[in-house]
A protein has these predicted regions:
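Conserved N-terminal alpha-helix of the aminotransferase class I/II PLP-enzyme fold
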Residues: 12-77, 90
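Short acidic loop-to-helix transition motifs that present clustered carboxylates
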Residues: 65-68, 92-93, 114-117, 176-181
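PLP-dependent aminotransferase-like
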Residues: 77-138
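Active-site phosphate-binding strand-loop segment of PLP-dependent enzymes
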Residues: 117-175, 180
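PLP-dependent enzyme catalytic core of the Aspartate aminotransferase-like
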Residues: 129-130, 134, 268, 333-334, ...
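Conserved active-site segment immediately N-terminal to the catalytic lysine
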Residues: 186-199
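Active-site C-terminal subdomain of aminotransferase-like
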Residues: 198-291, 297-299
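Conserved PLP-binding catalytic core of the aspartate aminotransferase-like
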Residues: 277, 281, 293-330
Length: 376
């Protein structure tokens, strides 16, 4: 799978067996809030996660997409006069759907196009200025995709954070593909909100996300219920409105995220990150010479997700009796699974946490298939 950062750790598998039943985690809830559970230490874990992401507060959510949707819902209430969200043009489809479901409008920041698809931070500033000129208001939010899902480009958040501070516009970092794989420094990058994915990048069973937010927005996010029944006088003052009481991660998702956290912290240290980048760039250095292959995205790679344009394989598929299915079958014969069936025009892969012997086998498999079909 391309989301290799979501592969469970041995510790997570053990926790999954113990806490896989329904509301298992909530059996230990004494305060009516999942984030207040002390045994297992959910509350301590969330404090540690906030330190790890270098942001003031963290709460679990149903997924990174839900984190983005909630941020936009909160800001829509806080700034009703604003209705435009600025996003990079490599943003995930869920960023757009989050905008749409909140009845907001989108303005895209352009990229440089093929083959690198670079985002220029100055285009964010120009887009903000254009929004002010067109509407007379600031954008409600600026969103940057830290690592995009298609090319694995790493975009530096700091220049965008500086621009957002200059204009006093909230800044949301979508770290679904980076939080848990690369170091995250929300303080340094001046991030107001960060959306992370446990099942994509933090070795948790899905679905689970995280929403990190600065203290400036604490009261907006953690707004307590104030409703009271007219007959029963029922009230639920400890419940958080935006989460319908509690985030829906009551058992396996949250406990596996917690169990994997020590491993996630270790693997995001500089030495481990550098080792993973050596692996992905090792593969690319050995296939870069092949005519009919084009590596898309910025190089050298700073994230292990790769998009390889493969017109040479497409040409083989046109005359092969198995058409586009031939490529998946060739990899399967070599002990490599996970390729999309019928696709020969592009190859997306993620080398994260493969051993060096697996990296070399994968590289050899690509070269072997090329040799078989006289692709040089």
């Amino acid at each position: 799978p391309i989301q290799r950062g979501g592969m469970l750790t041995p510790e997570a598998y053990k926790a999954l067996i113990s806490y896989g039943d329904g509301y298992s985690l909530c059996d230990n809830c004494l305060k009516g809030r999942i984030d207040k559970i002390e045994n297992p230490p959910v509350s301590d874990f969330l404090e540690d996660m906030a330190k790890f992401l270098e942001i003031d507060n963290v709460t679990p959510t149903a997924a990174a997409r839900e984190s983005k949707r909630l941020v936009m819902e909160i800001l829509s209430k806080k700034y009703p006069e604003r209705n435009i969200v600025i996003v990079d043009s490599l943003a995930h489809y869920t960023s757009y759907i989050a905008i749409e479901t909140n009845n907001l409008r989108v303005k895209e920041v352009p990229n440089s196009g093929k083959p690198e698809f670079r985002i220029d931070p100055q285009d964010y500033e120009r887009t903000i200025e254009n929004v002010i000129k067109e509407t007379g208001n600031l954008p409600i939010l600026v969103l940057l995709t830290h690592v995009d899902y298609k090319y694995g480009n790493v975009n530096d958040p700091k220049p965008i954070g500086e621009i957002c501070k200059k204009f006093q516009v909230p800044f949301l970092l979508n770290a679904a593909y980076s939080g848990g794989v690369l170091p995250i420094s929300c303080k340094e990058w001046m991030v107001d909100f960060v959306a992370c994915s446990g099942h994509k990048s933090m070795s948790a069973s899905g679905p689970i996300g995280l929403l990190g937010f600065s203290s400036e927005f604490y009261k907006d996010v953690m707004k307590h219920s104030s409703i009271k029944g007219n007959l029963t006088s029922k009230s639920f003052t400890n419940k958080i409105c935006i989460f319908m009481g509690c985030p829906p991660v009551y058992g396996a998702p949250l406990i596996t995220l917690m169990a994997s956290f020590p491993s996630v912290v270790k693997r995001t240290q500089k030495k481990r990150v550098e080792e993973e980048l050596k692996k992905v760039n090792y593969v690319l250095e050995r296939i870069n010479h092949i005519k009919g292959f084009e590596i898309l995205g910025k190089q050298p790679k700073l994230h292990p997700l790769v998009n390889l344009n493969t017109p040479a394989f497409k040409e083989v598929a046109e005359s092969h009796p198995r058409r586009g299915f031939f490529l998946r079958e060739e990899f399967k014969e070599r002990g490599i699974i996970g390729m999309l069936p019928g696709i020969s025009t592009e190859l997306k892969f993620n080398t994260y946490q493969l051993s060096w012997s697996q990296i070399k086998h994968f590289t050899s498999a690509i070269l072997s298939i090329c040799d078989k079909y006289n692709i040089t």
